[in-house]
């Protein structure tokens, strides 16, 4: 029986539940398999443990959009703008601002 990458990441987290690199890797695996709810839960755990530079907030926002949760997506993009700007990623911050401009009603 082959062990999936998701199972491997889960095993790694069992010994170190706050390992931000493993949490991010697990979230990426959930993204690949369209496990959106699990991806959101894992990204929120990651963001609680890591000083993200903005990328995870964009992933989180897109996951919320996929579930039709625009308010949560907006909040994630806004936090992503702040993170990207504070870490010197103006292009990412501008991308998120552009997406949010489409949210204007």
Where are these regions (language model features)?
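Conserved structural position within tetratricopeptide repeats
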Residues: 11-14, 44-48, 82
């Amino acid at each position: 029986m082959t062990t999936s990458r998701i199972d491997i990441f889960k095993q790694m987290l069992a010994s170190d539940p706050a390992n931000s690199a493993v949490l991010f890797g697990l979230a990426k695996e959930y993204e690949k398999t369209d496990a959106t709810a699990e991806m959101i839960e894992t990204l929120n755990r990651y963001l609680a443990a890591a000083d993200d530079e903005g990328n995870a907030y964009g992933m989180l926002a897109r996951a919320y959009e996929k579930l039709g949760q625009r308010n949560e997506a907006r909040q994630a993009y806004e936090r992503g703008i702040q993170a990207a700007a504070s870490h010197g990623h103006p292009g990412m911050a501008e991308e998120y601002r552009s997406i949010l401009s489409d949210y204007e009603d």
